[in-house]
Amino acid sequence: MTIAYNRGLTEVEAATSVSAVDTAKQTAITAMAAVKDNATLLADAKAAALAALDAAKAEYSQDDYATNWSVLEKAYNDGKTEINAAAAIEAVNSALQKATDAMAAVKNDATLLAEAKTAATDQLNSEYAKYKATDYTNANYELLTEKYNAGLSAIGGARTVDAVETALETAVAEMAAIKTNAQILADAKAAAKQAVNEAFAAYNEQDY
């Protein structure tokens, strides 16, 4: 503004004709009128930031965010609110960056599924590591390993987080259901005791 004003005075002073004076005057007035005040600059910054925020949100597809779309929309709407409420251009830029970062931080379904698979695989590996081959018959340990491998395959092939959790729970339960040598021995003892007891009960004390 000051530059336009001073230039206008200089050009008026340097004019050598009335028409040149009028031209210099009008040029200065037009130049000063074209200088944007703070309110206009702030409004322009807000409009640009809102447009940039809209463009950033348009890059995301709701189909990719079945789980977290509402979280992404909240980040977007919070950003709009902060931009509109900003009292300075710096605050506008900060609000835009904050909202853009917040949307980018929202995990899509593919990311959530990948994380669930990694976590489930790690947990299944930990469960399998608890079992020792020496505690089982060869056949039962082979069966346990089959259940473990089937679980890994089911987790890897799952298409939803719920399916991942189901695959993990199924594998863990099926491995746990396979009897150890100690359990087989205990079952045999219990069955034998029951058979002996039943045989003994068939005898009448009065007959002896």
Language-model segments: residues:
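Charged, amphipathic alpha-helical scaffolding segments
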Residues: L9-T27, A33-A34, T81-A105, S153-I178
